[in-house]
């Protein structure tokens, strides 16, 4: 429901592609372009990206055609809570560990985690990308940048041989 009291309808999905080496792991995106076909491909791709890390993680991807752009905090929170009313029974630390993606930042992940906690009465590591107040990482905003630097340093070492 928007702030004017109008009911809004959006489609939401979670594609769990592969959990052969660990729980499903992949982002959730909120963007008008999201559809099942795109998420199936992204979940497939996420399986391979995760396997290359050598961490025990499978691949998944999710999202909705809801776009948080231009929405109030209350509109975003109401949507996320409605989304979690369906998603919560399919995620968990040993099952599926979603993260943020396009249109899903710390605020949205925090709303998801809060609703998950309310529904399950558990304070577990079910979501990555949440704020520090919910047990998130201190350097989450910089993590991708650090990863790029480490990758570049390894590339330079490899090419200098």
PLM regions with names:
Residues 158-161:
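Conserved small/polar residues in nucleotide/adenosyl-binding loops
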